[in-house]
């Protein structure tokens, strides 16, 4: 199936490893022109080489709004236009409500909410002008089922989900779609850090996840917007 994204400019945030890298690799395989970012020069260069397809690496920390804006600006300079935006970022430190200090919350909100707001602010207006664009935000299953010992992530990611659904409605009919993908446990460095003892055979393959992100960026997904796609091997069982 031709997904209709060959030649499109794709900016994938925080793609040195894990689900961001897998998403960038899947987009590049479909012929998208991909720019990625990461904080470490060596790691982001290695990721770009692995992704292939002329992927361009940018050293940029998207853990706050300023970094998110800079990434989209620099990606636009490379690509000409950002047609496909995949927002992604690391999670804040684990911890319970009782042990997490009040002053830890602003950094978590910057990382998992404001960085996404900033990337969308920088990319979406020109998408609307061109009457085409795809925003796919990699969030977390925690927005449906809060995860134990992740109070900061649970709090911030719920906010970004509300923002994305509101934005999807505001740009509906303009040729721009906005969706989020909510991963359960996948075999990534972040999951290994948090759940090192969990059996690996019960986790998802990041490359499969990347294919879902890529479909959401496709021409065929033009009528799919405001959706929250949970990719968790059936772990989330609620009816609503």
Residue ranges and their predicted role:
Residues 120, 156-157, 164:
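Active-site helix of classical SDR
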Residues 145, 214, 225-240:
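Short C-terminal tail/terminal secondary-structure segment
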